[in-house]
């Protein structure tokens, strides 16, 4: 469901930052310009969205940029400090969490671009599987460095392309970076979450290669 995807984007956003890449604690290190996701995946930061900003908190102009375009990883996100270390220009991603804090790497509006299909169409195409509506303990059950996650979830079984019975207390395990490569479909049912520290906008997606246990 879209709400789960928004949570995951928030959790794994730091992996796109130049700071985690420099420290070698990002699985995306060394992957710029390479295929890191399904070709239908387009992840864009748009400073003209709900959290509109013409400049970041360091005075650098913000620009629209693709973190992932057609499955290919774009440039990493830089604030002024990381840009100086790398000999590059800031990408306009230096933001403060409070007026006392040092600018860290963040985003304005991060959006996973959907396709022209409804959530119901995704479920119909899935035929048999699981429609996950909520996950508990995202920050406890997900590792932002390795990408591994194991989350207590709930939702509905999908049978013959339709929602069947509800399921609760099931465990869903996988890896975020592997999941990106196995996205089969993206809906158009956008949900917007977040606030002044960054907006996350995503629709529901259809994913393969996850491990499910429970009833």
Model-derived features: positions:
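N-terminal small-residue-enriched
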Residues: 1-215
